[in-house]
């Protein structure tokens, strides 16, 4: 790993620990999906930043593109993945390459896939055959941004990077790739990972606001496949072998310690060069899949993993599972970390999110952010509920619920989230 990345990661940890308050999670329409709750040996793999029309590096696959090598390997093991594709980085200039082995290896101001001055070999815009192959073989394709420009500032590691100027620019960029996939392939991309997983944006917006608008879920991962990290070995072959080991051994050790370790997990992979312009994933993916197969795992796209359970803390053994799943499809009941926290008391803000129409909630929050540059997570829903007499004018979003509107709920004297969701009249959906 380059020293810049090491320093950036350590600095971020220190800031989070000493300065940044603990992250708060709120009920919303978009949640960050890193894993799901299941006892079955089923998991998912995501492949960021492709498709890549250049060969693997080093090329020991007769000139086949890296993406073809990955698809061949997945097919060999009966596995299918989620490919987080970009559109085209050809407009990301003027720019220059940074130091090899650093986070800026492919561009100081922008990302370039698969490499700087090779943009015409990357992305969905230039790789029609690869996109069609992904779809024909049952893989999922998700929206990783048309130009793969980060949504906001990221001072650690990417301090010199250009970022999108705000909410509208992010929506425009995602819509461009969304439309390309719809018009060219008749394919709709519901989940999405933001470029470099940057969430905070200018004007008080976040990636969650953008995905609310797009109707996406935020797709992330719980286990790093590690193919993007460069080895510090000076000899190229020794470096490649070290990178392959760094991808395979953590998975092997995790499975030896706990054979159920990967149940419901999402494993992050790279469909492109690492920071040293090598592609260890081309060599290590087969070893990883062989390990998972040895332990009886099925590897599926994230969309199919979500069919197992859409939640991180609730599975099919929960008596309310079907009700909760139906509610989550039309109402905001899940926290941003994809947890339900069923046995905690419900707050007034969470009740407002359950009752208010999605369009009203999102529109009001966006309008408030445009107007004054700040808005609470529940402000849009609270405003609608107050106007419709469902919560009192004096109620604060953090107050615990002590009564429920009779037209919306069957009688209950308990106000945990579990009991409130159980009492909700489903004919109000």
Residue ranges and their predicted role:
Residues 94-97, 154-157, 230-238, 311, ...:
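Short secondary-structure transition/capping segments
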Residues 50-61, 154-168, 274-278, 311-314, ...:
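Second-shell loop/turn segments in exported
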Residues 119, 123-127, 133, 146-268, ...:
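Catalytic domains of cell-wall/extracellular-matrix polysaccharide-remodeling enzymes
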Residues 42, 65-69, 126-129, 165, ...:
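Extracytoplasmic/secreted proteins, especially bacterial periplasmic and envelope-associated proteins
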Residues 75-79, 135-136, 175, 179-186, ...:
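Sec-exported extracytoplasmic/periplasmic mature domains
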Residues 306-321, 329-417, 426-429:
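Feature responds to low-complexity, polar/acidic, surface-exposed segments characteristic
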Residues 92-94, 149-155, 227-230, 360-363, ...:
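Short acidic/His/Gly/Ser-rich catalytic and metal-binding motifs that mark active-site loops
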Residues 3, 8-143, 147-153, 157-158, ...:
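Active-site beta->alpha N-cap acidic-glycine motif
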């Amino acid at each position: 790993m380059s020293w810049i990345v090491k320093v950036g990661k350590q600095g971020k940890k220190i800031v989070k620990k000493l300065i940044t308050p603990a992250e708060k999670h709120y009920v919303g329409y978009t949640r960050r999906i890193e894993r799901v709750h299941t006892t079955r040996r089923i998991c998912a793999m995501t492949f960021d930043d492709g498709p890549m029309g250049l060969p693997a590096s080093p090329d020991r696959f007769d000139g086949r593109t890296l993406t073809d090598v990955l698809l061949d390997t997945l097919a060999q093991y009966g596995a299918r993945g989620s490919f987080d594709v970009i559109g085209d980085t050809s407009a990301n200039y003027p720019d220059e390459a940074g130091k090899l082995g650093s986070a800026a290896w492919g561009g100081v101001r922008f990302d370039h896939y698969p490499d700087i001055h090779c943009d015409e070999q990357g992305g969905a815009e230039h790789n029609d055959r690869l996109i069609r192959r992904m779809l024909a073989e049952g893989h999922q394709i998700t929206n990783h941004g048309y130009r793969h420009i980060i949504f906001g500032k990221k001072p650690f590691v990417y301090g010199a990077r250009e970022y999108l100027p705000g909410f509208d620019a992010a929506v425009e960029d995602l819509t461009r790739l969304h439309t390309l996939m719809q018009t060219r392939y008749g394919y709709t991309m519901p989940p999405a990972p933001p470029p470099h997983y940057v969430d905070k944006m200018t004007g008080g917006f976040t990636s969650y606001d953008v995905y609310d608008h797009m109707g996406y879920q935020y797709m992330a991962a719980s286990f790093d496949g590690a193919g993007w990290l460069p080895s510090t070995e000076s000899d190229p072959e020794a470096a490649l072998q070290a990178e392959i080991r760094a991808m395979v051994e953590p998975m092997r050790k995790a499975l030896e310690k706990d054979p159920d370790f990967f149940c419901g997990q999402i494993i992050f992979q790279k469909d492109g060069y690492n920071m040293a312009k090598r592609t260890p994933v081309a060599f290590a993916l087969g070893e990883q899949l062989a390990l998972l197969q040895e332990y009886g795992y099925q590897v599926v796209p994230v969309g199919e993993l979500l069919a197992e359970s859409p939640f991180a803390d609730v599975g099919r053994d929960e008596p309310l599972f079907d009700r909760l799943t139906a509610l989550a499809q039309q109402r905001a009941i899940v926290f941003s970390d994809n947890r339900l926290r069923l046995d905690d008391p419900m707050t007034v803000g969470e009740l407002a999110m359950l009752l208010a129409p999605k369009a009203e909630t999102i529109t009001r929050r966006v309008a408030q952010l445009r107007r004054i540059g700040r808005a609470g997570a529940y402000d849009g829903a609270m405003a609608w509920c107050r106007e419709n007499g469902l919560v009192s004018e004096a109620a604060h979003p953090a107050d615990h619920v002590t009564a429920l509107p009779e037209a919306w709920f069957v009688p209950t004297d308990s106000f945990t989230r579990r009991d409130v969701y159980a009492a909700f009249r489903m004919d109000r959906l």
